[in-house]
């Protein structure tokens, strides 16, 4: 044989399994000294050299062999053509050369197309994207399915390539096609845990309610395969990204969807479009997405919206029916608070000790509820930012609110300490009054302990909010 194989680092073959080394793809490197054809060779030897040149990606030798008469549609074991192999390893230049030499971009073997091979190739997303783009430019059909009825977009979604998915849809791929098990591209992405692909498919109009043959939606498939972030994302009441790009022309879609960051190693956590924030999520969940532009024009944040009074709704042009939806949602979201009722008129001399004690007990209980609420928030917060499913507002907004909370708690602590000192002063004066006869109740220090406990609770709440503030700043 004119080209001896020199064993070295392994190079991916064509994926076939063979019983003899002579029938399949060789794994290895060509001897560099034997790459030039110095004399005519038998066809069988040329085919072997051709396979090895494809294996090593030796484009110059491939071109030389094609010039010598080797067919660009040569059929190797299992019926694979050179283009099929080049696509399987995402060798962009080799795919380009073979296509320029007349290779059939629509070739298929047992319903396995070159395009499907490229979408499921071993390689980086950038390489796969370029190969797919080349094949589509030569009229490869993005909707031809394999024997399992899986289309190229399903393979791209399964393997986690959002830009390939976007390109296929831009070239006419059916985003909601289903395979033999009822899986769509969205179902495959949810099953494999590819959040960036899920977001991209939602932008492109994927229907998240389509069920598999066993009756499961993509969100249920994600939950079954232990992908809680995707499960939460797909469980939103409405889909704010659905159909976002359907009105664009093909050229506009390609231009927008193929815009990518120059950092190739970047984790595509979100799509190339800005992800939706907390205000959008709240509005879409209530079916009030039409209010998004209005609120943004008036620079109304979610926090502002949730604290608006009824007259403010009208001033900002919010319709009565929309007001009712927001107020109903606020009623559901509102944390039950302990109402103090009418505070005792402490200035009056006839105020009873029981009334005043009741007020202090309610204040202490309220502080306890607040401490529990903050503890729950700290427990539930993700430990790292990449675990957050939906985009948050600037962390500065959160830390500023925490700073206000800490300041208010410090003020509250200071006022409670003043109250404690005042009560203690009154108590001391009363004890020193020679005309005063202490009652049995006064002999017991339990009321004093309650006051001390209230003061300690308030101080503890202040410390807890300080820790919460540090946690937000660190995130």
Curated annotation (Swiss-Prot):
What is the protein's major site of localization? cytoplasm
A GO term (biological process) for this protein?
transposable element silencing
UniProt ANK repeat ranges: 45-74, 78-107, 110-144, 148-177, 181-210, 214-243
Q: Give the record's subunit note.
A: Interacts with DDX4, PIWIL1, RANBP9 and TDRD1.
Task: Tell me, in a sentence or two, what this protein's role is.
Answer: Plays a central role during spermatogenesis by repressing transposable elements and preventing their mobilization, which is essential for the germline integrity. Acts via the piRNA metabolic process, which mediates the repression of transposable elements during meiosis by forming complexes composed of piRNAs and Piwi proteins and governs the methylation and subsequent repression of transposons. Its association with pi-bodies suggests a participation in the primary piRNAs metabolic process.
User: Does the keyword section mention Lyase?
Assistant: no
* Residue ranges constituting the SAM domain according to the UniProt record: 272-334
SMART domains on file: ANK (SM00248)
Q: Any idea which residues bear Phosphoserine here?
A: 17-18, 20
Q: Entry's InterPro entries? A: Ankyrin_rpt, Ankyrin_rpt-contain_sf, Asz1_SAM, SAM, SAM/pointed_sf
Fetch the Pfam families from UniProt: Ank (PF00023), Ank_2 (PF12796), SAM_2 (PF07647)
Highest taxon of the lineage: Eukaryota
| Species per Swiss-Prot/TrEMBL record | Loxodonta africana (African elephant)
What broad taxonomic lineage does this protein's source fall under?
A: Eukaryota, Metazoa, Chordata, Craniata, Vertebrata
Q: State what protein this is by name.
A: Ankyrin repeat, SAM and basic leucine zipper domain-containing protein 1
Is Protease set as a keyword in this record? no
Which GO cellular component terms, listed alphabetically, does the Swiss-Prot or TrEMBL entry include? pi-body
What subcellular compartments does it reside in? Answer: Cytoplasm
UniProt keyword annotations, A-Z? ANK repeat, Cytoplasm, Developmental protein, Differentiation, Meiosis, Phosphoprotein, Repeat, RNA-mediated gene silencing, Spermatogenesis
Where is the segment annotated Disordered? 1-24
């Amino acid at each position: 044989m004119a080209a001896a194989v020199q064993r070295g680092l392994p190079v991916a073959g064509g994926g076939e399994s063979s019983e003899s080394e002579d029938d399949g793809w060789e794994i290895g490197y060509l001897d560099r000294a034997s790459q030039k054809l110095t004399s005519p060779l038998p066809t069988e030897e040329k085919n072997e050299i051709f396979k090895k040149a494809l294996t090593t990606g030796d484009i110059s030798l491939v071109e030389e062999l094609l010039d010598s008469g080797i067919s660009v549609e040569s059929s190797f074991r299992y019926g694979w053509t050179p283009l099929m192999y080049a696509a399987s390893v995402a060798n962009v230049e080799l795919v380009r050369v073979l296509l320029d030499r007349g290779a059939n971009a629509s070739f298929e073997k047992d319903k396995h197309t070159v395009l499907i091979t490229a979408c499921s190739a071993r390689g980086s997303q950038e390489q796969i994207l370029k190969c797919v783009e080349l094949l589509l430019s030569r009229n490869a059909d993005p909707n031809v399915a394999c024997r399992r009825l899986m289309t190229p977009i399903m393979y791209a979604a399964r393997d986690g390539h959002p830009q390939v998915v976007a390109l296929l849809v831009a070239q006419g791929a059916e985003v909601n096609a289903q395979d033999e098990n009822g899986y769509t591209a969205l179902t495959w992405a949810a099953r494999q845990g590819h959040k960036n692909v899920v977001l991209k498919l939602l932008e492109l109009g994927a229907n998240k309610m389509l069920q598999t043959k066993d009756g499961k939606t993509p969100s249920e498939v994600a939950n079954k395969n232990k992908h809680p972030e995707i499960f939460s994302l797909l469980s939103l009441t409405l889909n704010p990204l659905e159909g976002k790009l359907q009105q664009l022309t093909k050229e506009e879609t390609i231009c927008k969807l193929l815009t990518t960051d120059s950092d190739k190693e970047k984790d595509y956590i979100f799509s190339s479009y800005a992800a939706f924030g907390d205000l959008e999520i709240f509005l879409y969940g209530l079916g009030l997405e039409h209010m998004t532009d209005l609120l943004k024009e008036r620079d109304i944040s979610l926090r502002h919206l949730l604290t608006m009074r009824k007259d403010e709704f009208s001033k900002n042009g919010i319709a009565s029916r929309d007001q009712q939806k927001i107020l109903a949602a606020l009623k559901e979201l509102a944390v039950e608070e302990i109402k103090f009722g009418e505070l005792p008129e402490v200035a009056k001399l006839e105020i009873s000790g029981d009334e005043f004690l009741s007020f202090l007990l309610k204040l202490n209980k309220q502080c306890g509820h607040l401490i529990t609420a903050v503890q729950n928030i700290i427990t539930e917060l993700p430990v790292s930012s990449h675990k957050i499913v939906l985009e948050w507002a600037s962390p500065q907004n959160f830390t500023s609110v925490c700073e206000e909370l800490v300041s208010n708690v410090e003020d509250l602590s200071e006022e409670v300490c003043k109250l404690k000192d005042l009560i203690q002063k009154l108590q001391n004066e009363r004890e020193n009054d020679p005309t005063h006869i202490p009652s049995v109740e006064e002999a017991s220090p339990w009321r004093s302990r309650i006051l001390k406990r209230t003061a300690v609770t308030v101080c503890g709440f202040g410390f807890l909010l300080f820790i919460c503030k540090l946690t937000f700043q660190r995130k």
